[in-house]
Curated annotation (Swiss-Prot):
Family: Belongs to the cysteine-rich repeat secretory protein family.
One annotated Gene Ontology cellular component of this protein: extracellular region
Protein name per Swiss-Prot or TrEMBL: Putative cysteine-rich repeat secretory protein 40
Annotated InterPro entries: CRR_secretory_protein, GNK2, GNK2_sf
Keywords from the named record: Repeat, Secreted, Signal
PANTHER family membership: CYSTEINE-RICH REPEAT SECRETORY PROTEIN 29-RELATED, CYSTEINE-RICH REPEAT SECRETORY PROTEIN 38-RELATED
N-terminal signal peptide: 1-32
Principal location class: secreted
Annotated compartments: Secreted
The encoding gene: CRRSP40
Length: 273
């Protein structure tokens, strides 16, 4: 007696479905922890012009790239600037608060490679990934103003899906969480590697949902007293960028925030607010 055709089909489909379920679970876990380093956005600073192959600018640029690549990436943030126009070069990077050492190094390398490919021979450009941003500019050491917040390069991203239930309450509670994290990021007791962290993460129960969030400022350039001002400014843009969205962020070069309905950071130090 032979098994029926339908039975054979079920026997064939069962291991296949089990494999698919396993893969989906794996993908979900990777996504929730954000283990990938997804490209987000870039901006070529075309007003700064282009450099010629073999020029002094290219020599200085490559020297800076190699110097920063040889660092330990322990602080997650660094900048290097030297020279005067037309050969002034500044490179800076900022890694996400949970992406230090090797993770930060690999993101920096991806940023440099991405700028070379997307903004070929541009003297200036910025690229954002999930775990860092990298900027190259021809601004001279004299003109490089570390006491000014840069809002020009801010841009929003959001999840297209909307939350269910009381959207107004969700918006208010999520903004309240971001504001609390902004205060925490600027707390003088919030230190990392001998410097103010200018970074904070946390989570909060909002109705039946749990919101996970983080805020961060560019440690190597933004003065601590400016971080709060920068974060307050972009959090005010929440209604325009993220109204009722299941996740959203505003990215820039001075500060940024992000929130999701799932955990997206590697660190386990998030505290329920």
């Amino acid at each position: 007696m032979y098994p029926s055709c339908s039975l054979l089909q079920r026997l064939v489909w069962f291991p296949f479905l089990a494999l698919v379920a396993t893969q989906l679970l794996f993908i979900r876990n990777v996504s929730s922890l954000n283990l990938t380093n997804e490209y987000l956005h870039h901006k070529c600073l075309v007003s700064e012009g282009k450099y010629k192959p073999g020029s002094k600018y290219e020599y200085i640029l490559n020297d800076h790239i190699r110097f920063l690549a040889a660092g330990n990436f322990r602080s997650g943030s660094m900048h290097m600037t030297s020279g005067l126009k037309p050969n002034a070069v500044t490179i800076l990077y900022q890694c996400r608060g949970d992406s230090y050492n090797s993770k930060c190094r690999s993101c920096y390398a991806a940023g440099i490679s991405g700028l070379r490919r997307r903004c070929p021979r541009n003297k200036g450009g910025i690229i954002w990934f999930d775990q860092c941003f990298v900027e190259i500019t021809s601004i001279s050491v004299i003109d490089f103003n570390i006491s000014k917040i840069n809002y020009e390069n801010n841009f929003p991203l959001h999840n297209p899906n909307r939350v269910s239930g009381d959207i107004k309450s969700f918006n208010n509670e999520t903004m309240a969480l971001l504001k609390e994290l902004a205060l925490k990021a600027n707390n003088k007791d919030n230190m990392d590697n001998g410097k103010m962290a200018l970074y904070a993460s946390g989570e909060k129960r909002v109705g039946t949902k749990k919101v996970y969030a983080m805020v961060q400022c560019m440690r190597d350039l933004v003065k601590p007293k400016m971080c709060k001002e920068c974060l307050e400014s972009i959090i005010k843009e929440f209604p325009e960028c993220c109204d009722g969205k299941q996740g959203g962020r505003i990215l820039g070069t001075s500060c940024d925030f992000r929130y999701e309905l799932y955990p997206f950071l590697r660190t386990s130090d998030s505290k329920t607010v």
